A protein has these predicted regions:
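ATPase/helicase motor core of nucleic-acid motors
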Residues: 330-452
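Helicase P-loop NTPase motor core
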Residues: 20, 24-32, 36, 263-266, ...
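Accessory C-terminal helicase-associated subdomains
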Residues: 425-546, 567, 595, 613
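Conserved helicase NTPase motor core
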Residues: 2-12, 16-21, 51, 79, ...
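Conserved helicase core region in the C-terminal RecA-like lobe
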Residues: 79-89, 209-212, 237, 340, ...
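Helicase C-terminal subdomain and adjacent C-terminal extension
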Residues: 601-616
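ATP-hydrolysis module of ASCE/P-loop NTPase motor domains
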Residues: 14, 75-77, 95-181, 205
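P-loop NTPase Walker
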Residues: 1-98, 199, 282-285, 588
């Protein structure tokens, strides 16, 4: 890609701080990679003195690959990495930090899920709520101590959130692990209190480039400011209009703070959108101009032609869903964007019932291992119990799969004693439950002596797990063939294992060949996210947050209503402005067509169109 005049000036910037205000589709990645190339080849900067920081591992890999291709190289000493990777590298070098010291995302997920079981929480979109809670925990840990007490969670009721948060911190402490927020604090304290270590890293990286700087938290910025002294060769690229991660501690004000910290910084505004048509850019600009706490940008489209933005109002959610279903049947690459994870549950259900495949999340197949599927986890729980483990979480997973009419009240302890459970049932004269419990115990004894293939078959046929799946699918109005296919593939994958322990170990670490990979991770509490496992769909369903950084030929924003977007818990000026930025991000994902849908009625409740629709 040839550079335009402003891009060229930014790329040629040499020493001293620089801020690149990069509007949507303005070629920010191109600017970063070309500047790295220019520093090395034109300015003769040693390549191992350059650090490029991104916010995701995928972005770091993509940027490095683009640089290597542009420079016609197979390897480079330039460091491309996330904040996470940089902080880990500093702590590893100074304190002997190990990867095993960092809590895994899966372990965080499992911990919160266990807390749900302990507190008897039952929500429909369990995966979405767990994800939100983990994000909010990170948000709270990034706040100053004086603000933590007044924090009001949006993921769940405050008392539950406080309980989970306290248990989470205790769990990390007793497990001798840290999360990303702990790593940031440790890195900050290390560099602030150890001048010789700070000096070492200041000399190591004399040129620092940061992508998506608007997403940086205050503590990340403080660390960066220490690292770039005294040379101040810091080159940030960001767009305060796309700052949408307030729940993680980011704020658009970090761009303003950069200007205050480096008052003599050069400012380059990339104001040409090479992605979207003129109609999309103009509509999005009208929207975002309603925000006051921002850098002004005179945005324009490289392609000023294009179809008008379409705004539709439907009588009901059902009518909206029917319209979308008919529209996406033309197989045109499309993204359906929602405000929350649960926002598209009914749409997914409808598409599933009508045989329309779709992808969830980042616009691509998720690539999740089939053994992450909740069905595989159910089988795993049966195997754990058959091997003599008595973890409450495993028992609660399968106690009513199939239904045994046994309440969780009989399993109060973390490690379950079957004899104690039977005693409680006897004290309550629950003969039917005693019979069902004895039947389960007998089934577990039988399974314990079987190889995995036979054990899975026994669980499916003798225990009645297949019957449970059929019943579940009838209740949810879902085609059972997909779930039966998962069970068949799980069972087939177990042929080469002789013991339950071998199979469990394989499930735990995912060491399995690619032919048993499955495209999606389903939540039992939510709906399956794709109705086929073979075809690659042109229909992508994801939240506005997860659409950031992506682009689509056609974008459909659904449920653009007050109380949904802006979210009903967004009250303050700052919160409303962040909601508007989120809507702006959603709009600017569209390359050619943008359709914005509102409904008059949802779940028998009357709704108003979003104020954002009126501002466009």
């Amino acid at each position: 890609m040839a550079l335009d005049q402003i891009q060229y000036k930014a790329v040629r910037h040499f020493n001293g701080p620089a801020m690149i205000l990069a509007g949507p589709g303005s070629g920010k990645t191109t600017v970063i990679t070309h500047r790295v190339f220019s520093l090395i080849n034109d300015r003769k900067v040693p390549d191992d003195e350059i650090l490029v920081i991104t916010f995701t591992k995928m972005a770091a890999v993509e940027m490095k690959e683009r640089y290597l291709k542009m420079a016609n190289l197979r390897f480079t000493p330039v460091d491309f990495g996330t904040f996470h990777a940089v902080f880990f590298m500093i702590l590893k070098n100074a304190c002997g930090f190990k990867a095993t010291d960092i809590v895994k995302v899966k372990d965080q997920w499992d911990f919160v899920k266990t807390q749900f079981s302990m507190y008897g929480v039952d929500v429909r979109d369990e995966n979405g709520v767990i994800s939100d809670i983990i994000s909010e925990i990170a948000r709270v840990k990034s706040l100053p101590d004086e603000k933590i007490q007044e924090y009001c969670p949006v993921s769940c009721e405050r008392r539950l959130f406080v309980s989970i948060f306290r248990e989470y911190e205790h769990w990390l402490e007793t497990s001798h692990m840290v999360d990303f927020e702990d790593m940031m604090k440790k890195t900050y304290c290390l560099l602030r209190n150890t001048p010789d270590i700070l000096n070492k890293w200041q000399n190591r990286y004399r040129y620092v480039l940061i992508d998506e700087f608007q997403d940086a938290s205050p503590i990340q910025f403080e660390i960066v400011k220490m690292l770039v002294m005294p040379h101040q060769n810091i080159f940030i690229v960001g767009d305060d209009d796309q700052s949408i991660y307030g729940f993680r501690g980011a704020a658009p004000g970090v761009m303003q703070e950069f200007k205050k910290s480096f008052p003599d910084c050069a400012v380059y505004t990339l104001n040409t959108n090479y992605r979207s048509t003129g109609s999309v850019v103009k509509a999005a600009t009208r929207l975002i101009n309603n925000n006051k706490d921002r850098f002004y940008k005179d945005l324009k489209a490289y392609n000023d032609m294009g179809e008008d933005v379409v705004k539709l109002i439907f009588e009901s959610t059902e009518e909206e869903i029917k319209y979308i279903s008919d529209l996406v049947s033309d197989k045109k690459p499309t993204a359906v964007l929602t405000r929350t994870n649960s926002g598209a549950v009914e749409l997914r259900r409808y598409l599933l019932k009508h045989g329309i495949s779709f992808n969830k999340s980042d616009g691509e197949r998720d690539g999740e291992n089939i053994f992450s599927h909740w069905i595989a986890q159910d089988i795993n729980a049966y195997f754990n119990l058959a091997r003599g483990e008595r973890v409450r979480r495993d028992l609660l997973r399968i106690i009513n799969k199939p239904s045994r009419y046994i309440s969780r009240q009989y399993f109060m302890e973390k490690d379950v004693d079957f004899d104690l459970v039977l005693l409680r049932m006897k004290q309550g004269n629950q003969d039917r439950l005693i019979k069902n419990m004895n039947s389960l115990m007998n089934d577990l004894r039988c399974i314990s002596s079987m190889p995995p293939y036979a054990a899975i078959n026994y669980i499916r046929k003798k225990v009645g797990y297949d019957a449970y799946i059929y019943s579940y699918c009838r209740k949810e109005e879902i085609n059972s063939e997909l779930f039966m296919s998962i069970l068949d593939r799980l069972q087939d994958s177990s042929r080469n294992f002789s013991t339950l322990e071998q199979w469990i170990n394989m499930v735990s670490d995912g060491t399995i060949s690619d032919d048993t990979r499955y495209p999606l991770k389903y939540s039992e509490k939510s709906l399956p996210d794709n109705c086929t496992s073979d075809s690659v769909s042109n229909v992508n369903i994801c939240t506005m947050h997860s659409s950031k950084g992506l682009e689509y030929e056609r974008v459909i924003i659904i449920d653009a209503n007050e109380g949904i977007t802006p979210y009903n818990k967004a009250v303050s000026k700052e919160e409303i402005e962040e909601e508007r930025r989120l809507f702006y991000v959603a709009m600017t994902r569209a390359k050619k067509n943008l359709i914005i849908c509102s409904v008059k009625r949802r779940n028998n409740k009357m709704l108003l169109p979003s104020r954002f629709v009126k501002e466009i």
